[in-house]
Regions:
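Leucine-rich, amphipathic alpha-helical/linker segments
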Residues: 87-88
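Short beta-edge/loop segments at beta->alpha junctions of small alpha/beta modules
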Residues: 1-80, 115-118
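Phosphate-handling catalytic interfaces
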Residues: 91-151
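Residues that recognize and position ribonucleotide moieties
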Residues: 11, 81, 147-151
């Protein structure tokens, strides 16, 4: 398929990222993005995590049971999401236990989300850091599945 490269490079992606990709290829018609997503959702190649957030299912895998990396989902829930709290310890391999709750910090976290076996809970950046413009102080950017994540 002609969009396989995008799907390989973006195991979890937003509708905005797909729109930018389609525009860069000159394929941005009025309903191109919607019809492309609808087609791939029908065929089981893409699953919707929440409105505007999607995960790719490899060819031949069973869409309802294929494990999707929860860290990638947590890092894409908002444009400024940072994996935080116990989730950051898990990501770095320093946690003593594994949780099914993924915690991320953001300036305006959306409502809690449950997707498959994980619960995603947002926490607001501390107001003092936001006022000082240092919401991402001490945040490192790590790579996972070829995608940058803020932890």
């Amino acid at each position: 398929m002609k969009h396989d490269r995008f799907f390989r490079e973006h195991p979890v992606f937003t509708g905005e990222e797909l729109g930018e990709y389609l525009a860069s290829r000159g394929e941005m018609g009025a309903r191109t993005q919607e019809s492309l997503l609808a087609y791939h959702r029908r065929t089981g190649r893409v699953v919707q995590v929440r409105r505007g957030l999607y995960a790719v299912i490899p060819p031949g895998a069973d869409a309802p049971t294929y494990p999707i990396d929860p860290f990638l989902i947590g890092a894409k829930l908002t444009p400024d999401a940072v994996l935080s709290h116990h989730t950051a310890l898990e990501f770095h391999g320093r946690a003593h236990s594994v949780h099914t709750r993924i915690t991320y910090s953001a300036s305006r976290p959306p409502a809690a989300l449950r997707f498959r076996s994980h619960a995603y809970q947002g926490a607001r950046f501390p107001h003092a850091l936001l006022r000082a413009g240092k919401a991402h102080a001490c945040v490192v950017t790590a790579e996972r599945a070829g995608m940058p994540l803020r932890v």
